Amino acid sequence: MLSRQQGLTAFFGITSIKSQNQTNPTTQVKKHQLNYQQWLDVLKQEAKIAAEKRPPNLSILAGDSLSLWFPLELLPESKNWLNQGISGESSGGLLKRLNLFDQTQPKIIFVMIGINDLIRGISDQVILENYQQIMAELRQMHPDTQIVIQSILPHASENATWEGRDKLLAIPNSRIRQLNRKIQAIATEQGVKYLDLHPLFVNNQGNLRPELTTDGLHLSPQGYLVWSSALQLYSQMELGSKE
């Protein structure tokens, strides 16, 4: 079963999202235990609302649970946000559902995907092929949109409390670094932006900094604050480059 911290937000501007978020998070999690197909239906409906309302400065988060659980209050307030994350998502799964938001008109689409592929034993070659197709399809569907590929984050398997700790232990963070370099190369070839978050999250041993994670895989509030700061800085730099 999959859960969503924010509940079924549909689509609202940042201000409205904050007001929608005053209910007990625990109650929301219990209320919204959904399977994968149910999540697809929810995201399709949310994207439909965004496509109909056509809000200004729309940005989309596309990915897995790391994107899904991004605290709404930490997202840059200069934008309207549509969260298209699903817990446990893989690059292949994301590729198959890009059409869910193909009628929206976002300014930016931020993509982070891949850690669940590694956990499931999917080869780097397949991951890279999926990334290549994701970038190509997003460029075709959204020719006027800036596509931003974000690096796969490291993990902290040694001290992980996540239930799949053994699977994390089998994934060297050095492999993630190498995979990120190849993803960046594909992004460069396709004319897609690449946002390297990886250095912000690693310690001297190349692992996910312990204060930035809740269980060795998922992010803590501090972790999301680091990510949020990177998005803020990126947005400011992009805005400055257009002035």
Regions found by a protein language model. Name each.
Residues 33-35, 78-91, 167, 216:
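Acidic/histidine-rich helix-loop elements
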Residues 98, 131-135, 180:
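Generic structural signal for well-ordered alpha-helices
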Residues 1-58, 72:
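N-terminal secretory targeting modules
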Residues 68-76, 92-129, 154-160:
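Oxyanion-hole/transition-state-stabilizing segment in secreted/luminal serine hydrolases
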Residues 115-116, 139-173:
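Active-site segments of SGNH/GDSL-like serine hydrolases
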Residues 58-62, 82:
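Conserved beta-strand elements of the Class I
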Residues 157-243:
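Catalytic His-Asp segment of secreted/periplasmic serine-dependent ester chemistry enzymes
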